[in-house]
């Protein structure tokens, strides 16, 4: 006799309803608020008879965390000032210098760059220093900021 189409195969419905209708994940673990649901799912502690194991594990974790905090407090001196970590190009520079292979080359390369970028000091002789001062004194007094120069006039040019 052929199977009727409107009946499921044996035990299918029992299999579907074995776990019951599940609540949404946010409401699934009411008694263990504050515990990461992912953690519960991974460790299979969501079942009621295993909650004791979870509580023990949580207690052990808390003890370990507090012990670690105490150890850190004992090691770290509160009055010591932390050195500031350089940011951006300074950090990059330090990283290059500390590099085992690139360190030697980069030092000379950076030194050369610094030499090229330095502003050159203006060297003036005594006679040269007096000449521009006289030129400024002999030039006519400048007009106030708001006043405009006549149309054909040009700005005064400084003497070399």
Swiss-Prot record:
The modification N6-acetyllysine is found at residues 33, 145. Residues 1-34, 115-160 are annotated as: Disordered. It is found in: Cytoplasm. Residues 127-142 are annotated as: 2 X 8 AA tandem repeats of A-X-A-K-A-P-A-[KQ]. GO terms for molecular function: heparin binding; structural constituent of ribosome. Residues 126-160 have a biased composition (Low complexity). Component of the large ribosomal subunit. Belongs to the eukaryotic ribosomal protein eL29 family. This is Large ribosomal subunit protein eL29. The lineage of its organism: Eukaryota, Metazoa, Chordata, Craniata, Vertebrata.
